[in-house]
Design a protein with these regions (language model features):
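His/Asp/Glu-rich, glycine-adjacent segments
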Residues: 32, 45-158
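A short acidic (Asp/Glu
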Residues: 3, 22-27, 142-145
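Short, charged/polar micro-motifs that form catalytic or ligand-binding hotspots
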Residues: 8-20, 42, 46, 157-161
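A generic structural motif
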Residues: 35-49, 160-167
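N-terminal extension/subdomain marker
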Residues: 25, 32-37
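Beta-strand elements within well-structured catalytic alpha/beta cores of enzymes
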Residues: 7-26, 56, 130-134, 168
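Conserved helicase/translocase P-loop NTPase motor core
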Residues: 1, 150-154, 163-167
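A short acidic-Thr-Gly-centered motif at the start of a beta-strand
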Residues: 1-9, 121-123
Length: 168
């Protein structure tokens, strides 16, 4: 937690199912507000949300989560949602490192919750860490295969990137 240890307030924004080519498509929209320090990393496989997001938030590999926190791990065969324990997983990581950070966790999956979140941003500034998961790109990705209208709007990779840019 180097930034938090330095006293910085952090907004960790995770855009689910956001690809590198999509990032490159929208980066210039944010450039006037932010500076970027980019580094490429590799990911665990599979990159399925259940494994990747739970690992990011816990700071552990999936097998470690299952062993250390079985009450927070949902098996692949289960009908239960696989990412319902993200906030508790963040808490476990903070506690494992013996930190006392204040944090909030928000998962945005529709425009109404997005508006609500924007309205409470001033109160979030009191937290040292704020985690925000944006699900639009993931929903768009799934709709691209399941919804004829979205399939027609995003017929090619370039069109898909353009649709992502429009959302931004």
């Amino acid at each position: 937690f180097p930034m938090l240890d330095n006293g910085d307030k952090v907004f960790f924004i995770l855009i689910d199912n956001f690809r590198l080519d999509q990032w490159r498509e929208v980066k210039d929209l944010l450039a006037e507000y932010y500076t970027f320090d980019e580094s490429l990393y590799y990911s665990i496989l599979p990159t399925a949300t259940q494994y990747a997001r739970n690992s990011i938030f816990s700071g552990l590999m999936p097998l470690q989560i299952e062993k250390m926190f079985p009450e927070l791990w949902v098996d692949e065969d289960s009908e239960e949602g696989k990412n319902l324990n993200e906030a508790p997983l963040i808490q476990t990581q903070i506690e494992r490192f013996r930190k006392k950070y204040t944090f909030s966790y928000h998962k945005v999956h529709d425009s109404q919750y997005n508006d609500k979140l924007l309205n409470i941003v001033p109160s979030l500034l009191h937290n040292q860490l704020n985690v925000v998961v944006l699900n639009f790109v993931d929903m768009l990705s799934h709709a691209r295969t399941e919804n004829k209208m979205i399939r027609e709007l995003a017929q090619s990779e370039a069109a898909y990137r353009s649709l992502t840019r429009s959302w931004f």
